[in-house]
A protein has these predicted regions:
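ATP-dependent helicase/translocase motor core
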Residues: 2-333, 337, 341-360, 378-383
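Conserved motor-coupling elements within RecA-like helicase/translocase cores
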Residues: 367-383
Protein backbone atom coordinates (compact mmCIF):
# COMPACT_ATOMS: atom_id res chain seq x y z
CA UNK A 1 0.00 0.00 0.00
CA UNK A 2 2.93 2.32 0.62
CA UNK A 3 3.87 2.40 -3.05
CA UNK A 4 0.32 3.42 -3.96
CA UNK A 5 0.82 6.65 -2.05
CA UNK A 6 3.58 7.53 -4.47
CA UNK A 7 1.97 6.40 -7.72
CA UNK A 8 3.14 8.40 -10.72
CA UNK A 9 -0.11 8.85 -12.61
CA UNK A 10 0.41 5.76 -14.76
CA UNK A 11 -1.30 3.31 -12.43
CA UNK A 12 -3.93 1.11 -14.00
CA UNK A 13 -6.87 -0.47 -12.25
CA UNK A 14 -5.29 -3.94 -12.26
CA UNK A 15 -2.24 -2.65 -10.35
CA UNK A 16 -4.46 -1.06 -7.73
CA UNK A 17 -6.40 -4.32 -7.53
CA UNK A 18 -3.17 -6.25 -6.92
CA UNK A 19 -2.11 -3.82 -4.20
CA UNK A 20 -5.55 -4.00 -2.56
CA UNK A 21 -5.42 -7.80 -2.55
CA UNK A 22 -1.89 -7.78 -1.13
CA UNK A 23 -3.04 -5.59 1.73
CA UNK A 24 -5.96 -7.94 2.44
CA UNK A 25 -3.46 -10.80 2.49
CA UNK A 26 -1.37 -8.90 5.05
CA UNK A 27 -4.28 -8.87 7.53
CA UNK A 28 -5.12 -12.56 7.14
CA UNK A 29 -6.98 -13.29 3.90
CA UNK A 30 -5.67 -16.03 1.60
CA UNK A 31 -5.51 -15.21 -2.10
CA UNK A 32 -7.06 -17.49 -4.71
CA UNK A 33 -7.40 -16.57 -8.39
CA UNK A 34 -10.92 -16.93 -9.68
CA UNK A 35 -9.81 -18.94 -12.71
CA UNK A 36 -8.19 -21.55 -10.43
CA UNK A 37 -11.46 -22.52 -8.75
CA UNK A 38 -13.01 -25.70 -10.21
CA UNK A 39 -16.59 -24.64 -10.85
CA UNK A 40 -19.22 -23.85 -13.43
CA UNK A 41 -19.50 -20.11 -14.13
CA UNK A 42 -23.13 -20.33 -13.03
CA UNK A 43 -22.02 -21.42 -9.53
CA UNK A 44 -21.13 -18.70 -7.02
CA UNK A 45 -19.95 -20.79 -4.04
CA UNK A 46 -16.57 -22.46 -3.52
CA UNK A 47 -17.83 -25.99 -2.86
CA UNK A 48 -14.52 -27.35 -1.58
CA UNK A 49 -14.20 -24.68 1.13
CA UNK A 50 -17.84 -24.97 2.19
CA UNK A 51 -17.67 -28.74 2.60
CA UNK A 52 -14.27 -28.61 4.32
CA UNK A 53 -15.62 -26.18 6.93
CA UNK A 54 -18.74 -28.29 7.58
CA UNK A 55 -16.66 -31.46 7.89
CA UNK A 56 -14.38 -29.74 10.42
CA UNK A 57 -17.01 -28.04 12.59
CA UNK A 58 -19.91 -30.52 12.25
CA UNK A 59 -18.07 -33.87 12.14
CA UNK A 60 -21.23 -35.77 13.01
CA UNK A 61 -22.68 -35.17 9.54
CA UNK A 62 -22.21 -37.86 6.90
CA UNK A 63 -20.65 -36.84 3.55
CA UNK A 64 -24.00 -37.16 1.80
CA UNK A 65 -25.60 -34.98 4.50
CA UNK A 66 -22.92 -32.34 3.97
CA UNK A 67 -23.71 -32.49 0.25
CA UNK A 68 -27.41 -32.06 1.01
CA UNK A 69 -26.67 -29.05 3.23
CA UNK A 70 -24.50 -27.56 0.49
CA UNK A 71 -27.36 -27.91 -1.99
CA UNK A 72 -29.72 -26.20 0.46
CA UNK A 73 -27.44 -23.16 0.62
CA UNK A 74 -26.57 -23.28 -3.09
CA UNK A 75 -30.23 -23.33 -4.15
CA UNK A 76 -31.39 -20.65 -1.71
CA UNK A 77 -32.98 -18.24 -4.19
CA UNK A 78 -36.68 -19.11 -4.19
CA UNK A 79 -38.02 -15.75 -2.92
CA UNK A 80 -37.42 -12.20 -4.13
CA UNK A 81 -33.78 -11.15 -4.41
CA UNK A 82 -33.90 -9.14 -1.18
CA UNK A 83 -35.77 -11.82 0.78
CA UNK A 84 -33.21 -14.37 -0.37
CA UNK A 85 -30.36 -12.08 0.73
CA UNK A 86 -32.00 -11.65 4.14
CA UNK A 87 -32.66 -15.38 4.54
CA UNK A 88 -29.12 -16.36 3.59
CA UNK A 89 -27.67 -13.71 5.92
CA UNK A 90 -29.66 -15.21 8.81
CA UNK A 91 -28.32 -18.65 7.90
CA UNK A 92 -24.78 -17.27 7.96
CA UNK A 93 -25.24 -15.65 11.37
CA UNK A 94 -27.50 -18.18 13.13
CA UNK A 95 -26.86 -21.42 11.24
CA UNK A 96 -29.09 -23.60 9.08
CA UNK A 97 -31.74 -25.84 10.60
CA UNK A 98 -31.01 -29.28 9.17
CA UNK A 99 -32.42 -32.75 9.73
CA UNK A 100 -29.84 -35.52 9.25
CA UNK A 101 -30.71 -39.16 8.68
CA UNK A 102 -31.27 -39.82 12.40
CA UNK A 103 -34.32 -37.55 12.22
CA UNK A 104 -33.21 -35.14 14.98
CA UNK A 105 -33.19 -31.54 13.75
CA UNK A 106 -30.01 -29.56 14.50
CA UNK A 107 -28.61 -26.09 13.79
CA UNK A 108 -25.53 -26.32 11.60
CA UNK A 109 -23.28 -23.22 11.72
CA UNK A 110 -21.97 -21.89 8.42
CA UNK A 111 -19.48 -19.53 10.11
CA UNK A 112 -17.63 -19.97 13.41
CA UNK A 113 -17.81 -16.55 15.06
CA UNK A 114 -16.36 -17.72 18.38
CA UNK A 115 -13.19 -19.23 16.91
CA UNK A 116 -12.27 -17.20 13.81
CA UNK A 117 -9.31 -19.43 12.94
CA UNK A 118 -11.73 -22.29 12.19
CA UNK A 119 -12.99 -20.37 9.16
CA UNK A 120 -11.54 -20.30 5.64
CA UNK A 121 -10.91 -16.70 4.52
CA UNK A 122 -10.34 -16.19 0.80
CA UNK A 123 -9.79 -13.05 -1.24
CA UNK A 124 -10.61 -13.84 -4.87
CA UNK A 125 -10.28 -11.64 -7.96
CA UNK A 126 -11.70 -11.87 -11.48
CA UNK A 127 -14.37 -14.36 -10.43
CA UNK A 128 -16.46 -14.90 -13.55
CA UNK A 129 -20.23 -15.30 -13.14
CA UNK A 130 -22.44 -16.31 -16.04
CA UNK A 131 -25.93 -15.04 -16.84
CA UNK A 132 -28.40 -15.19 -19.72
CA UNK A 133 -29.23 -12.01 -21.64
CA UNK A 134 -31.83 -12.28 -24.42
CA UNK A 135 -31.03 -15.94 -24.80
CA UNK A 136 -27.26 -15.35 -24.99
CA UNK A 137 -24.71 -16.41 -22.38
CA UNK A 138 -22.81 -13.43 -21.01
CA UNK A 139 -20.56 -12.89 -18.00
CA UNK A 140 -19.79 -10.40 -15.26
CA UNK A 141 -16.55 -10.36 -13.29
CA UNK A 142 -16.45 -8.40 -10.00
CA UNK A 143 -13.01 -7.04 -9.17
CA UNK A 144 -12.60 -8.61 -5.73
CA UNK A 145 -14.76 -10.91 -3.62
CA UNK A 146 -14.24 -11.94 0.00
CA UNK A 147 -15.26 -15.53 0.68
CA UNK A 148 -15.70 -17.10 4.10
CA UNK A 149 -16.13 -20.87 4.08
CA UNK A 150 -16.87 -20.82 0.38
CA UNK A 151 -19.55 -18.10 0.56
CA UNK A 152 -18.98 -14.63 -1.00
CA UNK A 153 -19.77 -12.24 1.86
CA UNK A 154 -18.49 -8.97 0.39
CA UNK A 155 -18.07 -7.57 -3.12
CA UNK A 156 -15.36 -4.95 -3.71
CA UNK A 157 -15.36 -2.80 -6.82
CA UNK A 158 -12.24 -0.78 -7.63
CA UNK A 159 -11.57 2.08 -10.04
CA UNK A 160 -8.30 3.35 -11.46
CA UNK A 161 -6.70 5.89 -9.06
CA UNK A 162 -5.06 7.68 -12.00
CA UNK A 163 -8.20 8.04 -14.13
CA UNK A 164 -10.20 11.17 -13.26
CA UNK A 165 -13.17 9.81 -15.20
CA UNK A 166 -13.37 6.56 -13.21
CA UNK A 167 -15.13 7.35 -9.93
CA UNK A 168 -16.43 5.42 -6.97
CA UNK A 169 -19.91 6.38 -8.15
CA UNK A 170 -19.25 4.21 -11.19
CA UNK A 171 -18.21 1.41 -8.82
CA UNK A 172 -21.44 1.87 -6.86
CA UNK A 173 -23.52 1.69 -10.05
CA UNK A 174 -21.69 -1.45 -11.08
CA UNK A 175 -22.72 -3.23 -7.88
CA UNK A 176 -26.16 -1.85 -7.13
CA UNK A 177 -27.49 -1.66 -10.69
CA UNK A 178 -25.62 -3.95 -13.08
CA UNK A 179 -24.81 -6.80 -10.70
CA UNK A 180 -28.32 -6.88 -9.24
CA UNK A 181 -29.73 -6.85 -12.76
CA UNK A 182 -27.40 -9.47 -14.25
CA UNK A 183 -25.96 -11.66 -11.47
CA UNK A 184 -28.30 -11.45 -8.47
CA UNK A 185 -27.41 -15.05 -7.62
CA UNK A 186 -24.01 -13.75 -6.45
CA UNK A 187 -25.38 -10.86 -4.40
CA UNK A 188 -27.78 -13.20 -2.57
CA UNK A 189 -24.71 -14.14 -0.49
CA UNK A 190 -23.09 -10.67 -0.34
CA UNK A 191 -24.56 -8.39 2.33
CA UNK A 192 -21.54 -6.08 2.22
CA UNK A 193 -20.03 -3.91 -0.51
CA UNK A 194 -16.94 -1.71 -0.72
CA UNK A 195 -16.11 0.83 -3.43
CA UNK A 196 -12.71 2.44 -3.86
CA UNK A 197 -10.54 4.46 -6.22
CA UNK A 198 -7.58 4.60 -3.86
CA UNK A 199 -8.26 8.16 -2.77
CA UNK A 200 -11.80 7.42 -1.59
CA UNK A 201 -12.77 4.09 -0.06
CA UNK A 202 -16.33 3.59 1.16
CA UNK A 203 -18.27 0.83 2.94
CA UNK A 204 -21.94 0.02 2.47
CA UNK A 205 -24.27 -2.82 1.64
CA UNK A 206 -25.45 -4.12 -1.71
CA UNK A 207 -28.67 -2.13 -1.09
CA UNK A 208 -27.14 1.09 0.25
CA UNK A 209 -27.82 4.37 -1.64
CA UNK A 210 -24.61 6.00 -2.86
CA UNK A 211 -24.83 8.90 -0.40
CA UNK A 212 -24.85 6.44 2.51
CA UNK A 213 -21.57 4.73 1.64
CA UNK A 214 -19.12 5.98 4.26
CA UNK A 215 -15.39 5.96 4.93
CA UNK A 216 -14.07 4.00 7.92
CA UNK A 217 -11.69 6.52 9.45
CA UNK A 218 -10.31 4.67 12.48
CA UNK A 219 -8.85 1.21 13.02
CA UNK A 220 -9.41 1.44 16.78
CA UNK A 221 -11.29 3.89 18.94
CA UNK A 222 -9.06 6.80 19.87
CA UNK A 223 -6.93 6.57 16.72
CA UNK A 224 -6.27 9.70 14.72
CA UNK A 225 -8.77 10.14 11.89
CA UNK A 226 -7.42 9.05 8.50
CA UNK A 227 -7.99 11.79 5.92
CA UNK A 228 -5.07 11.55 3.47
CA UNK A 229 -5.32 9.86 0.05
CA UNK A 230 -4.81 6.09 0.28
CA UNK A 231 -5.01 6.26 4.09
CA UNK A 232 -8.73 5.59 3.71
CA UNK A 233 -7.95 2.31 1.97
CA UNK A 234 -5.46 1.23 4.61
CA UNK A 235 -7.79 2.16 7.44
CA UNK A 236 -10.71 0.37 5.78
CA UNK A 237 -8.74 -2.84 5.34
CA UNK A 238 -7.32 -2.85 8.87
CA UNK A 239 -10.44 -1.46 10.55
CA UNK A 240 -13.09 -3.54 8.78
CA UNK A 241 -11.46 -6.45 6.98
CA UNK A 242 -9.05 -7.90 9.52
CA UNK A 243 -10.80 -11.30 9.81
CA UNK A 244 -11.79 -11.13 13.49
CA UNK A 245 -13.09 -7.55 13.12
CA UNK A 246 -14.87 -8.48 9.88
CA UNK A 247 -16.74 -11.30 11.62
CA UNK A 248 -17.70 -9.00 14.50
CA UNK A 249 -19.17 -6.42 12.12
CA UNK A 250 -20.81 -9.08 9.95
CA UNK A 251 -22.51 -10.76 12.90
CA UNK A 252 -23.96 -7.84 14.83
CA UNK A 253 -23.62 -4.62 12.86
CA UNK A 254 -25.60 -5.36 9.71
CA UNK A 255 -29.23 -4.39 10.22
CA UNK A 256 -32.24 -5.93 8.50
CA UNK A 257 -35.83 -5.18 9.45
CA UNK A 258 -38.07 -8.08 10.46
CA UNK A 259 -38.71 -10.53 7.66
CA UNK A 260 -42.32 -9.40 7.17
CA UNK A 261 -40.99 -5.97 6.12
CA UNK A 262 -38.61 -7.28 3.45
CA UNK A 263 -40.66 -5.42 0.85
CA UNK A 264 -39.00 -2.22 2.16
CA UNK A 265 -35.61 -3.66 1.10
CA UNK A 266 -33.80 -2.02 4.01
CA UNK A 267 -30.28 -3.20 4.83
CA UNK A 268 -27.77 -1.08 6.76
CA UNK A 269 -24.21 -1.57 7.95
CA UNK A 270 -22.84 0.50 10.82
CA UNK A 271 -20.58 3.50 10.39
CA UNK A 272 -17.37 3.52 12.38
CA UNK A 273 -18.65 5.92 15.13
CA UNK A 274 -21.68 3.65 15.69
CA UNK A 275 -19.48 0.57 15.90
CA UNK A 276 -17.09 2.00 18.47
CA UNK A 277 -19.89 3.69 20.46
CA UNK A 278 -21.93 0.48 20.77
CA UNK A 279 -18.82 -1.45 21.79
CA UNK A 280 -17.80 1.05 24.47
CA UNK A 281 -21.33 1.47 25.79
CA UNK A 282 -21.70 -2.28 26.17
CA UNK A 283 -18.39 -2.50 28.05
CA UNK A 284 -19.42 0.35 30.34
CA UNK A 285 -22.86 -1.12 31.05
CA UNK A 286 -21.47 -4.58 31.77
CA UNK A 287 -18.88 -3.10 34.14
CA UNK A 288 -21.56 -1.04 35.88
CA UNK A 289 -23.91 -4.01 36.33
CA UNK A 290 -21.23 -6.46 37.47
CA UNK A 291 -19.61 -3.99 39.88
CA UNK A 292 -22.98 -2.46 40.88
CA UNK A 293 -21.66 1.09 40.54
CA UNK A 294 -24.76 2.46 38.84
CA UNK A 295 -22.49 4.41 36.48
CA UNK A 296 -23.28 3.24 32.99
CA UNK A 297 -21.78 6.25 31.27
CA UNK A 298 -22.84 8.97 28.84
CA UNK A 299 -22.55 8.99 25.07
CA UNK A 300 -22.70 12.26 23.13
CA UNK A 301 -23.70 12.03 19.47
CA UNK A 302 -24.08 14.91 17.04
CA UNK A 303 -27.32 15.50 15.14
CA UNK A 304 -27.57 13.11 12.21
CA UNK A 305 -24.90 10.71 13.46
CA UNK A 306 -27.33 7.79 13.63
CA UNK A 307 -27.86 7.55 17.40
CA UNK A 308 -31.05 5.50 17.02
CA UNK A 309 -29.18 2.83 15.06
CA UNK A 310 -26.37 2.98 17.62
CA UNK A 311 -28.95 2.12 20.28
CA UNK A 312 -30.20 -0.77 18.13
CA UNK A 313 -26.67 -2.14 17.74
CA UNK A 314 -26.11 -1.74 21.50
CA UNK A 315 -29.40 -3.46 22.36
CA UNK A 316 -28.46 -6.42 20.15
CA UNK A 317 -25.11 -6.67 21.93
CA UNK A 318 -26.75 -6.68 25.37
CA UNK A 319 -29.36 -9.19 24.26
CA UNK A 320 -27.15 -11.70 22.45
CA UNK A 321 -23.55 -11.25 23.60
CA UNK A 322 -23.87 -11.19 27.39
CA UNK A 323 -25.10 -14.74 27.92
CA UNK A 324 -22.03 -15.56 30.02
CA UNK A 325 -22.75 -12.68 32.42
CA UNK A 326 -25.45 -13.86 34.87
CA UNK A 327 -26.05 -10.35 36.21
CA UNK A 328 -27.35 -9.35 32.78
CA UNK A 329 -29.00 -12.54 31.55
CA UNK A 330 -31.90 -11.69 29.24
CA UNK A 331 -32.32 -7.97 29.88
CA UNK A 332 -35.35 -5.76 29.61
CA UNK A 333 -34.26 -2.56 27.89
CA UNK A 334 -36.04 0.76 28.40
CA UNK A 335 -35.30 3.60 25.98
CA UNK A 336 -36.37 7.07 27.11
CA UNK A 337 -36.59 9.94 24.63
CA UNK A 338 -37.25 13.63 25.22
CA UNK A 339 -38.77 14.72 21.91
CA UNK A 340 -41.76 13.64 19.84
CA UNK A 341 -39.47 13.46 16.82
CA UNK A 342 -37.26 10.89 18.56
CA UNK A 343 -40.32 8.98 19.75
CA UNK A 344 -41.55 8.62 16.17
CA UNK A 345 -38.06 7.80 14.92
CA UNK A 346 -37.61 5.14 17.60
CA UNK A 347 -41.00 3.55 16.98
CA UNK A 348 -40.34 3.46 13.25
CA UNK A 349 -37.09 1.55 13.76
CA UNK A 350 -37.60 -0.65 16.81
CA UNK A 351 -41.14 -1.82 16.05
CA UNK A 352 -39.71 -3.51 12.95
CA UNK A 353 -36.65 -4.93 14.72
CA UNK A 354 -37.85 -7.82 16.90
CA UNK A 355 -35.66 -10.33 15.06
CA UNK A 356 -32.61 -8.07 15.19
CA UNK A 357 -33.00 -7.23 18.89
CA UNK A 358 -33.94 -10.77 19.95
CA UNK A 359 -35.70 -9.40 23.04
CA UNK A 360 -39.28 -10.42 22.29
CA UNK A 361 -42.02 -7.80 22.33
CA UNK A 362 -41.31 -4.18 21.46
CA UNK A 363 -43.73 -1.87 23.30
CA UNK A 364 -44.38 1.87 23.37
CA UNK A 365 -45.38 3.16 26.82
CA UNK A 366 -47.29 6.39 27.34
CA UNK A 367 -46.48 7.22 30.95
CA UNK A 368 -44.95 5.95 34.20
CA UNK A 369 -48.02 3.93 35.14
CA UNK A 370 -47.95 2.11 31.84
CA UNK A 371 -44.21 1.51 32.25
CA UNK A 372 -44.72 -0.01 35.72
CA UNK A 373 -47.34 -2.35 34.27
CA UNK A 374 -45.03 -3.41 31.47
CA UNK A 375 -42.08 -4.06 33.79
CA UNK A 376 -44.24 -5.81 36.37
CA UNK A 377 -45.63 -8.19 33.78
CA UNK A 378 -42.27 -9.57 32.65
CA UNK A 379 -39.31 -11.22 34.32
CA UNK A 380 -36.92 -10.77 31.41
CA UNK A 381 -36.68 -9.65 27.81
CA UNK A 382 -38.64 -6.95 26.06
CA UNK A 383 -37.79 -3.55 24.65
Amino acid sequence: MAKLKNYNGRYCESEYESAFIAFLESVGWHYLAGNQIPRSYSEVLIAEDFKAFIAKTSPGLLPEETEQLYDTVRLAGAESDFSTLHKVYKWMVDGVQFTPQNGLSIMVPLIDFETPENNIFRVVNQFTVEYINNGQRETRRPDVLLFVNGMPLCVIELKNPADANATIYDAWEQITIRYWRDIPQLLHYCPLACISDGVKTRLGTVRTPYEHFYAWRRVNDGDKLSTMPFEETETMVRGVYAPERFLEIFRDYIYFQDEIFDCDEREIVCRYPQFFAARLLKQSIVKSVVEQTGKGGTYFGATGCGKTYTMAFLARQLSLRCGDIPQIGSPTIVMIVDREELQEQGIKLFAKSKEFLNLGDVSVVKDRKHLRQELGARESGGF
